[in-house]
Curated annotation (Swiss-Prot):
Record organism: Azoarcus sp. (strain BH72)
Protein name: 6,7-dimethyl-8-ribityllumazine synthase
Top-level division of the source organism's lineage: Bacteria
Family: Belongs to the DMRL synthase family.
EC numbers for this chain: 2.5.1.78
GO molecular function: 6,7-dimethyl-8-ribityllumazine synthase activity
GO biological process: riboflavin biosynthetic process
Organism phylogeny: Bacteria, Pseudomonadati, Pseudomonadota, Betaproteobacteria, Rhodocyclales
Length: 156
């Protein structure tokens, strides 16, 4: 543990060796989602996660992501989970509904299962914003998943 102002700090790292990672990706706004997935899996492998220990499930849209995350989390087969998708504002209230319900579901499942979930579902005003953010967000999710899986192991 590191020390910060004489307080012991739990340390985590970004070593993904041996970690089992599940990814749930929406197929809606597929170009953006595939960009997120590419960046995410590339970063996971850079961090040492073996491709053989990465499992991907695709779902029709963002609202279907939480259910599959829940099943993966309950399976005991994963150290961390990642949600990938893109909800892009349209002309109706549907954007808020999908974004809020999906986000709340992901948070609840992480708390209920005790499995860390990196939320990589972009919520943007337009396609250009989503395309501009997909690479960085995909990589960020990979790092967050690995760091949180390792932190939870330290806390056990």
């Amino acid at each position: 543990m590191a020390r910060y102002d004489n307080i012991a700090e739990f340390e985590s790292d970004l070593n993904g060796k041996g970690l089992r990672v599940g990814i749930v990706m929406s197929r809606f706004n597929q170009d953006v989602c595939e960009g997120l997935l590419s960046a995410c899996t590339e970063e996971l492998q850079k961090l040492g996660v073996s491709p053989e220990l990465i499992r991907i499930a695709t779902v029709p849209g963002a609202l279907e992501i939480p259910l599959v995350l829940q099943k993966m989390g309950q399976s005991g087969k994963f150290d961390a989970l990642i949600a990938l998708g893109a909800v892009i504002r349209g002309e109706t209230y549907h954007f808020e509904l999908v974004s809020n319900e999906m986000g709340a579901g992901i948070t609840r499942i992480g708390l209920d299962t005790g499995i860390p979930i990196a939320n990589g579902v972009l919520t943007t005003e337009d396609d250009d914003q989503a395309l501009a953010r997909m690479q960085e967000k995909g990589s960020d999710c990979a790092r967050a998943a690995v760091e949180m899986a390792n932190l939870l192991k330290v806390l056990q």
